[in-house]
Amino acid sequence: MLAFGRITSILFFVLSLSFLTCALPTPAGQTNALAARGTGADLLKICADLETNVKAKVDVIANIDLKVLADVEVHVEAIIEIVTIAAKAIVTLDAHIEIDADIKAQIVVHVAAVIRLIVNLCVTLIAKLGVSVVLALLVKLDVCLQLLLANLSIVIEGIVGLVVNLIADITAKVLANVHLDLCLKVLGLPL
């Protein structure tokens, strides 16, 4: 009986050690699961959709035989509305979010493409209709682009500088010639 008591006490001791080891906290594994579910993907989707929608409207305008302002005004107003809606959607995200570098690069590419599309549209409108005819539309386009860039700079710190680097071939003189003065100020380009 004495041997049975010793064996059971040893078994209970081993069992208590196993309970102790199971109760110890374990280190969490290194995973990036939360990084993929952040607001960076939402921002990327907004910018990609913006580029797609603006490109579709610019293509529609390119296929129109421009003779008078009324031919193009509805389509330019639609572009202004698309950019404004995207800018308002961007500002609803958190301020100064941290996103991956590859997502940030994709966002910069989309925004730079939107700026290029709008600048090319402005150049086309001025060439075909004249500055005095489309000046009101140019000012509206300038305001909506300024809103987009300002809201992007609120959400992602330093993104405006990356956009400037990507649109370096569009000089400040071109932006000034198409009357996008507010964009010049936001982008920090000298005349």
Report residues per predicted region.
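A taxonomically broad motif for mature regions of secreted/extracellular
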Residues: 25-191
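Fungal secretory targeting signals
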Residues: 1-38
